């Protein structure tokens, strides 16, 4: 049986930096998708680091919905990410969207926003390297 391919879409400046916006990969989590894209592009994590310096954060959508997280946790900490849907394996994962958001755009009360640095640390913390 062939593994189902998940559509991962990088938006805006992130897609421009990587040189590609849509990826179709056999992954079961956001962390696995990020690691796979970085391994193939050699640019994703360095783009996260550069964009962090430019105050760009990310809205992550899983299956076209903002990811779920424990609102009592600071999402930009390892514990916060571990308690979120970002850390889960998904049986029905169909799509992941990574959307850059300029810090100060006042989305933090509406959407779950996370820094690129935290996304990288999250991949390391889950033993994905």
Task: Report each predicted region and the residues it spans.
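Membrane-active amphipathic alpha-helices enriched in small hydrophobic residues
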Residues: 110-129
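Juxtamembrane/start-of-transmembrane alpha-helix segments at the extracytoplasmic/lumenal side
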Residues: 105-109
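Terminal export/targeting leaders at protein ends
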Residues: 1-104
């Amino acid at each position: 049986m062939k593994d189902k391919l998940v559509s991962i879409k990088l938006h805006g400046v992130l897609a421009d930096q990587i040189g590609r916006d849509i990826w179709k990969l056999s992954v079961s989590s956001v962390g696995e998708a990020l690691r796979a894209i970085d391994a193939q592009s050699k640019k994703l994590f360095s783009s996260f680091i550069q964009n962090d310096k430019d105050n760009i954060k990310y809205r992550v959508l899983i299956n076209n919905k903002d990811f779920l997280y424990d609102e009592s946790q600071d999402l930009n900490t390892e514990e916060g990410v571990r308690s979120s849907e970002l850390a889960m394996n998904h049986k029905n994962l169909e799509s992941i969207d990574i959307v850059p958001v300029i810090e100060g755009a006042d989305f933090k009360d509406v959407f779950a926003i996370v820094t690129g640095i935290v996304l990288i640390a999250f991949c390391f913390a889950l033993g994905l390297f």
